[in-house]
């Protein structure tokens, strides 16, 4: 059994699997889109042994009425796809995922077995999310298989969002420089999706909207048109998610910076799956994060705290001048040893490093004095000597290290956040993932304090409008020949009713 939240994708997955068999019942799916007759057929094929692979939505697995069915046949193992959905620290938390473990326990009891083997899969799990997955699925000591998060063929760029009109203009210019290439543009709201899709259509692009407010048939047709290259661009909300497997998506644009780096990584991951170049362009404004922060006002304190930390990480990524690949991989707990990846805006247009040895010493001394009990903003206020209510209430304004960074040159007064972030990348500081991002000094940090060595940082980025269309344009192509080949590929694909990317890349 494969547990998956991607209802829109299930039919496609099952069709592909059945395509390898002469029997169209070797794979089935079970979710809320099926009528009673279809459900009866699925249950019959499963019980008779014809079906070897069953995709189910978590809601269908956990539904009380379905329990006798799942208890009536032998299950060799359960594959939990998109397993990050089980964690409140994940970017796409689904409460129904928390009920998978109790349901499996009920099935195991009825089948008179100790447990049902479980494999959990995700492309976007931080250390905290991995711990949550193991805890909530009852996997105390599982074997873990972790591949690299690095996608070397993807180019990452963040541009300043000055206004909606300017963002539209930059996006249209960018897409024109990649005309005929498949791409996805993400917007935060349905209204923005509809408006942008219309603007792109008016500018001569083959684009279509995709969001949860559209009928299932409309969304299915849009997906199909995108696969068959009847349209080049899908403008979507996060409802699109990972709902399509098109290997030759050449660019992903974010009109609004996502609310978490997991969401950003997963959505940009649609680009360049065939190994070819993919461009990931995001537009960023601090105002967008303030709006997202306001949306959390109605949530519980725990949800607000988690949401705030996720936004802080997104802000750090957007504003950094360090290699974006290094920052992104570090967030997922993976070291990237190169200083320049050569394939992000910061590495293409690097800023100068500035001396920050004294600043790092101030920060590490402060974290040590505070016994690793406080998060980043608190530490920055402490180092700067800001007697906030929180610091005074804790009595930490009396510590000798309080304000130890006051003497740092005013020209680099904004250096503290870059020092902390880049100190984490260097391995001197770590965030306590179990306790709301408290800053801790590592053993390497303690050694550095004993014998300080030169340390420099890149100040955070000042946003400037980019005057080009990003990397990977079509200037080196023979465009007439490219269009002829593309047309030929489309005709052959249409004749055989298969996606064009299957013919050739």
Feature map (PLM): residue ranges:
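Flexible coil/turn residues that form the inter-helical turn or adjacent wing/linker of helix-turn-helix
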Residues: 114, 321, 372
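A general alpha-helix detector
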Residues: 153, 248, 291-295, 310-314, ...
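Short, charged low-complexity linear segments at domain edges
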Residues: 303-335
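Accessory DNA-binding and partner-docking regions appended to nucleic-acid-acting proteins
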Residues: 307, 337-505
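Walker A/P-loop
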Residues: 1-6
């Amino acid at each position: 059994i494969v547990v998956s939240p991607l209802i829109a994708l299930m039919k496609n997955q099952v069709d592909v699997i059945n395509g390898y068999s002469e029997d169209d019942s070797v794979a089935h799916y079970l979710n809320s889109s099926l009528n009673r007759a279809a459900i009866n057929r699925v249950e019959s094929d499963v019980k008779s042994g014809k079906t070897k692979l069953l995709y189910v939505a978590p809601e269908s697995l956990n539904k009380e009425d379905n329990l006798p069915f799942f208890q009536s046949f032998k299950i060799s193992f359960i594959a939990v796809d998109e397993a990050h959905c089980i964690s409140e620290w994940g970017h796409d938390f689904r409460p129904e995922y928390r009920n998978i473990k109790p349901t499996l326990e009920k099935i195991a009891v009825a089948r008179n077995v100790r447990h049902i083997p479980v494999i959990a899969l995700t492309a976007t799990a931080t250390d905290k999310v991995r711990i949550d997955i193991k805890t909530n699925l009852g996997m105390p000591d599982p074997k873990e298989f972790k591949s690299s998060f690095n996608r070397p063929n993807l180019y990452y760029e963040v541009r300043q969002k000055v206004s909606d009109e300017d963002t539209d203009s930059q996006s249209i210019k960018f897409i024109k420089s990649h005309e005929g290439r498949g791409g996805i543009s993400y917007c935060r709201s349905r209204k923005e999706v509809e408006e942008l899709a219309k603007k792109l259509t008016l500018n001569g692009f083959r684009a279509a909207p995709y969001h949860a407010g559209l009928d299932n048939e409309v969304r299915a047709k849009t997906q199909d048109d995108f696969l068959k290259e009847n349209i080049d661009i899908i403008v979507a909300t996060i409802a699109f998610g990972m709902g399509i497997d098109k290997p030759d998506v050449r660019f992903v644009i974010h009109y609004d910076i996502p609310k978490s780096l997991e969401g950003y990584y997963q959505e940009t991951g649609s680009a360049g799956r065939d190994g070819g170049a993919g461009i990931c362009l995001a537009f960023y404004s601090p105002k967008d994060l303030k709006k997202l922060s306001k949306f959390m006002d109605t949530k519980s304190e725990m949800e607000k705290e988690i949401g705030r930390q996720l936004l802080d990480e997104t802000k750090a990524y957007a504003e950094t001048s360090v290699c974006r690949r290094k920052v992104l991989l570090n967030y997922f707990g993976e070291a990237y040893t190169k200083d320049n990846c050569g394939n992000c805006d910061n590495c293409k247009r690097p800023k100068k490093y500035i001396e920050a040895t004294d600043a790092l010493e101030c920060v590490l001394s402060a974290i040590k004095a505070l016994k690793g009990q406080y998060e980043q903003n608190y530490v920055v206020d402490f180092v700067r000597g800001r007697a906030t209510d929180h610091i005074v209430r804790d009595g930490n304004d009396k510590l000798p290290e309080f304000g130890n960074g006051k003497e740092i040159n005013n020209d680099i007064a904004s250096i503290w956040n870059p020092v902390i972030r880049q100190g984490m990348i260097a391995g001197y500081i770590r965030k306590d993932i179990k306790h709301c991002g408290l800053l801790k000094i590592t053993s390497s940090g303690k050694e550095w304090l004993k014998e300080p060595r030169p340390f420099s940082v890149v100040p955070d980025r000042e946003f400037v409008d980019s005057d080009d269309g990003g990397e990977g344009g079509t200037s080196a192509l023979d465009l007439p020949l490219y269009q002829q080949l593309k047309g030929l590929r489309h005709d052959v694909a249409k004749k055989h009713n298969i996606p064009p990317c299957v013919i050739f890349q």
